[in-house]
Amino acid sequence: MKHKYLIAVSGGPDSMALLNKKRHLVEAVCHVNYHDREDSDNDEKIVRDYCKKYNLKLFVFDTHKDDVSKYKDINNLQTWYREIRYDFFEKISQELGIKKILIAHQKNDFLESAYMSLNKNKKNLFLGIRRKSKFRSLILIRPLLNKTKKSLEQYCRSKNIEFVIDYTNFWDRYSRNVVRKMMAEWDKKTFQKFYLKVKWFNLKNMFFIKLLDSKFNNWIKQDFDINYFLKIKNNYKESLIYLFLNHIGIKPNENKIEQIIEFINKNKNGSVKKYRLKENQFIEIKNKKILYSIC
């Protein structure tokens, strides 16, 4: 189905603006009701009303009605949200045969992510959020990365599009919210200066990133053959494992990346020993291939 997308819509100004801008390209709308706020049903109503008005197909995952038992061992709330959300998106993607999904991350989200990465002193090749990326079997597309949150709210008001403001975005219990509140106090000059710093950083690394993406795509085509990986120069290996983890839907961190490289080096002769990624998810090496499994 050419030029048709899924779209993730929360009911907030960012996703409602994106939906209104791209609805002619949308095959189906995906909404998750986490029931994490007293008024979360209002978010769903806003999305339902819009979809009804424009005759758009809507799929809703409701954590009070749908089965969430498989997530009971997840202790981190943000991880719980993410696993539910992307499992749901994948399910709808497979049902409709559409891999591309529009996500409403915007310029503020981009800079918040960049700031948090810099503060963690991580070995960064790219700061912020990519316009296009792969996650599990999905292709995520983010058309709003050059739009500020304020401009999207103004757009919704100018078009009389109803939206909801999630007050939990201002709670200090999440590190991103602390960064968000700090950046909200920046003047335009400070905001733009940091934005240009991030863009310049990414531009300097663009050649390496493109080369890395090419190598990773070749590795996918070879079904994650370990001989291909072992022949790669060491300065690419950490980044390839980062992309591998992201590809299978596991949040990467430096310790996990180092441990997986060590696991591959120790088991390159085809040991059936497994490496535990998290809970019931593992990788193992069989027939010189890295296999991912859920037990």
UniProtKB/Swiss-Prot annotation:
Keywords: ATP-binding, Cytoplasm, Ligase, Nucleotide-binding, tRNA processing. Its EC number is 6.3.4.19. Its main location: cytoplasm. It is found in: Cytoplasm. It catalyses: cytidine(34) in tRNA(Ile2) + L-lysine + ATP = lysidine(34) in tRNA(Ile2) + AMP + diphosphate + H(+). One of its GO terms (molecular function) is tRNA(Ile)-lysidine synthase activity. ATP binds at residues 10-15. It is an enzyme of class 6 (ligase). One of its GO terms (biological process) is tRNA modification. Pfam families: ATP_bind_3. InterPro entries: Rossmann-like_a/b/a_fold, TilS/TtcA_N, tRNA_Ile_lys_synt, tRNA_Ile_lys_synt_N. Belongs to the tRNA(Ile)-lysidine synthase family. Ligates lysine onto the cytidine present at position 34 of the AUA codon-specific tRNA(Ile) that contains the anticodon CAU, in an ATP-dependent manner. Cytidine is converted to lysidine, thus changing the amino acid specificity of the tRNA from methionine to isoleucine. The N-terminal region contains the highly conserved SGGXDS motif, predicted to be a P-loop motif involved in ATP binding. This is tRNA(Ile)-lysidine synthase. The lineage of its organism: Bacteria, Bacillati, Mycoplasmatota, Mycoplasmoidales, Mycoplasmoidaceae.
